[in-house]
UniProtKB/Swiss-Prot annotation:
It is found in: Cell membrane. It is an enzyme of class 3 (hydrolase). It comes from Bacillus cereus (strain ATCC 14579 / DSM 31 / CCUG 7414 / JCM 2152 / NBRC 15305 / NCIMB 9373 / NCTC 2599 / NRRL B-3711). Belongs to the polysaccharide deacetylase family. It catalyses: peptidoglycan-N-acetyl-D-glucosamine + H2O = peptidoglycan-D-glucosamine + acetate. The lineage of its organism: Bacteria, Bacillati, Bacillota, Bacilli, Bacillales. This is Peptidoglycan-N-acetylglucosamine deacetylase BC_1974. The active site is at D76 (proton acceptor), H230 (proton donor). Keywords: Cell membrane, Cobalt, Hydrolase, Membrane, Metal-binding, Nickel, Transmembrane, Transmembrane helix, Zinc. Coiled coil: none annotated. The keyword Protein biosynthesis does not apply.
């Protein structure tokens, strides 16, 4: 009888320990900062989920009594092996674009950086690492942009000011980092249209290009649009001819970013940058 009682007591203790352990694990899974950050990082990877941004730009200039419509094609993450083809297409259509470059690719493809600038496109910075934790949690955004800027300046002979935040400026580019951006003399551009070009890597290029073009053309409704694309994907470059044609039919012209006529395009609506 006494032996049976001891066994019951041991079982009760073991159950209690297990319950405490399970409760602690569940609490950690909910409140752990590491898990919260990981969840946050997974969210910001999806550029398409960033908020819509209204551009704080004055009324566009008019030509022959008509309001001008301007599309700013922007390409992130390059240069890469498809960039030369993209530049050929832009040249054929007499269209200018804006490129946001990764430091490692600047080093690998200096001739493409030089060509982008020589053909009238704007060359800006997209960081060295494209790493959320380093750029935002560790506060290295401005330092990485300065390093990237230096690499570009060594090739094109001038230091660009415009940056494109990897994953978009929200939520990573907090007020403290934005203050540093302003102090460093940099500007920030997010986008008004996400082409979602990165989403179609596993589709046939032609089908993917058609979908990307549709994404852009469907959403191009305002006098100025800043369009997010990436020149490291074949489907992105393949989509450009249809995008150019479709936007022209909707009355758009194509311009590169100009520092002297900067206007804010950021998810924070921070007019300083």
């Amino acid at each position: 009888m006494e032996k049976a009682l001891k066994i019951k007591q041991i079982v009760v203790v073991l159950i209690a320990i297990a319950a405490v352990a399970i409760g602690y694990y569940m609490f950690q899974s909910i409140t752990s900062p590491a898990k919260a950050v990981a969840k946050q990082e997974n969210v910001v990877q999806l550029a398409s989920e960033q908020p819509k941004v209204e551009m704080n730009k004055t009324a566009p200039s008019r030509f022959n009594g008509k309001e001008r419509k301007v599309a700013y094609l922007t390409f992130d993450d390059g240069p890469g092996k498809y960039t030369a083809e993209l530049l050929n297409t832009l040249k054929q259509h007499d269209a200018k674009a804006t490129f946001f470059l990764i430091g490692a690719n600047v080093k690998e493809f200096p001739d493409l950086v030089k060509r982008e600038n020589a053909e009238g496109h704007y060359v800006g910075m997209h960081s060295m690492t494209h790493n959320f934790a380093k750029l935002y949690k560790n506060g290295e955004y401005v330092n990485e942009m300065k390093e990237d800027q230096g690499l570009i300046a060594n090739i094109i002979g001038k230091s660009p000011k415009l940056t494109r935040p990897p994953y978009g400026s929200m939520p990573g580019l907090n007020e403290g980092l934005r203050n540093k951006v302003v102090e460093g003399g940099f500007k920030v551009w997010d986008w008004t249209i996400d082409s979602l070009d990165w989403r179609y890597n596993k589709m046939p290029v032609d089908a993917a290009a058609a979908q990307i073009a549709q994404n852009v053309l469907t959403n191009a409704t305002k006098p100025q649009e800043v369009i997010l694309m990436h020149d490291i994907h074949p489907q992105s470059v393949a989509a450009v001819p249809a995008i150019l044609k479709g936007l022209k039919e909707k009355g758009y012209e194509f311009e590169a970013y100009h520092e002297e006529s900067h206007f804010p395009v950021n998810f924070w609506h921070d007019n300083r940058m």
